[in-house]
């Protein structure tokens, strides 16, 4: 493990000091490739979770992408789409979520009172390790750190290491 608990070889990395404005052609090409890789990973996640949550299902293009500011969806956008789909399709979303999340109905009701907290519960139960949407990352699941460094430098920023607790390596 590096800095993603339970996911050996996965390394959260970041860049700092990105200037505003248009990016170079080199950076645009890398961004396009990363966007395609992320979208493919998200679509696969949606297929797995759709199978588990049926009949509550979402469409990545129709239900998830409109929730994003620039078409760059995260697990959190996907979770919001599922919560909205259950609200639209289920007569009692609390009963639905209690069944699908393996939780007591009262616990689900309490969690649902805090929108962000409930989103975290859904994400953790469905998309994180042990959940039906989770797949152990492989060597090609995420871009190599060298590609992220190249993007960061092409944008005129600085590549940086990220630490799990923000304090220690």
What are these regions (language model features)?
Residues 1-168:
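Extended substrate/RNA-proximal surfaces in nucleic-acid metabolism proteins
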């Amino acid at each position: 493990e590096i800095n993603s608990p339970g996911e050996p070889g996965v390394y959260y990395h970041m860049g700092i000091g990105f200037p505003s404005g248009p990016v170079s052609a080199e950076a645009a090409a890398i961004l396009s490739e990363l966007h395609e890789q992320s979208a493919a990973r998200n679509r696969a996640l949606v297929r797995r979770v759709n199978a588990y949550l049926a009949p509550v299902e979402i469409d990545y293009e129709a239900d998830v992408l409109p929730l994003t500011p620039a078409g760059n969806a995260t697990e959190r956008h996907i979770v919001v789409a599922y919560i909205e789909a259950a609200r639209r399709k289920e007569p009692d979303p609390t009963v639905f979520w209690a069944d699908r999340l393996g939780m007591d109905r009262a616990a689900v009701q309490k969690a649902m009172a805090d929108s962000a907290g409930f989103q975290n519960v859904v994400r953790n139960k469905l998309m994180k390790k042990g959940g039906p949407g989770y797949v152990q990352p492989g060597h090609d699941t995420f871009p190599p750190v060298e590609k992220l460094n190249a993007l960061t430098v092409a944008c005129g920023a600085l590549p940086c290491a990220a630490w799990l607790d923000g304090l220690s390596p």
